[in-house]
């Protein structure tokens, strides 16, 4: 997901991976080599890297193939002999495509798993399959790690399990307060409004440094479709999990070298704690007191709202390289999913794009419109990017949801 900061090309955008011939090759490679050839080999130290790669591919592309269960059960059988990264890839793939059926095997591994992140991933699988497991899982965690409160991942796991049946019901504080607060700083801001159910796509809006939201020449609010769901759908504090809520820092506009992200200009974001807080704050701040400095970015009425701190907790847990980008991935991988045709990611925010499969040229792009709106909005080339869940409705965020919020704010200006 590393991206190179650069000015976008003025030439038509082209992605060879979007050609139908390349998409067909990728599908064949996943079918014949990633799964077929890997399963023909024993899972031993010599071939372990192939199983790890297969698990990563399962998490990203979510292919429908009955052989996947065979591969995952083989990984479970050999789990104690696997390297840490292969264990993580297996648990991520399992969480992605098999929400049930592996409970007894994972429960047997839980007591011996000494890696906090892997322990957390096992707990999350068991809690999702049966929410009644929550109390027992918390008790095991506290018994194993009495100082869990001091560990970034385990403390987030504890909060997540405690709030699993409550957070969706709690509405956020007044969103207008966020709009007014950002205006008071005179800092350009992108807001990505999401649902708690990240299967549902959200919408992004751009507020200039003058406090006004970007509109078209007819005065219509500009909104941009965006998915904040990772392939795994793991929580925000796990690597490759869903995009955390909270405040990211926009460092500018760049272009990626990743073929699946594609060449469309993206918004370069940094998180709390990423790269030693370098460049995160858009104003003078004391990074020796990061909690107080982050809190200052929130209106007073939002500082006790736990979801607004997800980005802080995720950064503290080691998450990095979350950006807002487009996609060249064949949307047919996700046919039938609520978020089709947008691609889930490794935790970034993804806008839909349409590439001509015959020429590889970009035909339509929400991502391009978003970056252009940010570029043209009043203010410098940097700013903040704020991700907020509005509620737990099982439907995408729609224009009417945001027009009500934004117009109420603008009437009060």
Q: What is each PLM-predicted segment?
A:
Residues 6-62, 67-72, 80-88, 92-99, ...:
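Cell wall/extracellular polymer interaction/catalysis modules
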């Amino acid at each position: 997901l590393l991206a190179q900061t650069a000015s976008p090309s003025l030439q038509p955008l082209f992605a060879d991976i979007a050609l139908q011939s390349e998409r067909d090759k990728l599908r064949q490679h996943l079918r014949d080599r990633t799964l077929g050839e890997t399963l023909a080999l024993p899972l031993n130290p010599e071939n372990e890297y192939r199983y790890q790669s297969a698990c990563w591919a399962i998490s990203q592309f979510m292919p429908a193939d009955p052989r996947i269960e065979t591969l995952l059960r083989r990984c479970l059988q050999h789990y104690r002999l696997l390297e840490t990264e292969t264990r993580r890839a297996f648990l991520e793939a399992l969480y992605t495509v098999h929400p049930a059926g592996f409970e007894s095997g994972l429960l047997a591994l839980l007591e011996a798993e000494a890696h906090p992140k892997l322990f957390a991933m096992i707990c999350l699988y068991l809690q999702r399959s049966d929410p009644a497991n929550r109390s027992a899982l918390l008790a095991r965690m506290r018994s194993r790690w009495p100082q869990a409160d001091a560990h970034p991942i385990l403390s987030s796991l504890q909060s997540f399990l405690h709030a699993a049946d409550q957070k969706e019901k709690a509405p956020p504080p007044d969103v207008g307060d966020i709009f007014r607060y950002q205006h008071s700083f005179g800092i350009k801001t992108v807001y990505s409004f999401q649902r708690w159910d990240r299967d549902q796509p959200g919408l992004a809006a751009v507020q200039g440094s003058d406090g006004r939201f970007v509109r078209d020449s007819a005065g219509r609010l500009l909104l941009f479709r965006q998915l904040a769901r990772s392939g795994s759908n793991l929580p925000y504090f796990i690597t490759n999990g869903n995009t955390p809520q909270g405040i990211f820092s926009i460092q500018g506009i760049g272009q990626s070298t990743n073929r699946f992200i594609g060449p469309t200009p993206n918004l370069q974001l940094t998180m709390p704690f990423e790269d030693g807080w370098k460049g995160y704050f858009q104003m003078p701040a004391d990074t020796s007191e990061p909690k107080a400095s982050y809190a200052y970015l929130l209106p007073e009425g939002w500082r006790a709202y736990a979801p607004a701190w997800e980005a802080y907790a995720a950064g503290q847990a080691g998450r990095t390289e979350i950006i807002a980008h487009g996609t060249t991935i064949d949307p047919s991988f996700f046919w039938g999913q609520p978020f089709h045709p947008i691609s889930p990611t490794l935790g970034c925010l993804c806008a839909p794009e349409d590439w001509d499969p015959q020429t590889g040229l970009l035909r339509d792009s929400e991502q391009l419109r978003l970056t252009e709106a940010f570029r043209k909005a009043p203010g410098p080339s940097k700013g903040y990017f704020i991700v907020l869940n509005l509620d737990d409705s099982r439907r995408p965020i729609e224009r009417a949801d945001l027009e009500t919020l934004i117009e109420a704010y603008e009437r009060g200006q």
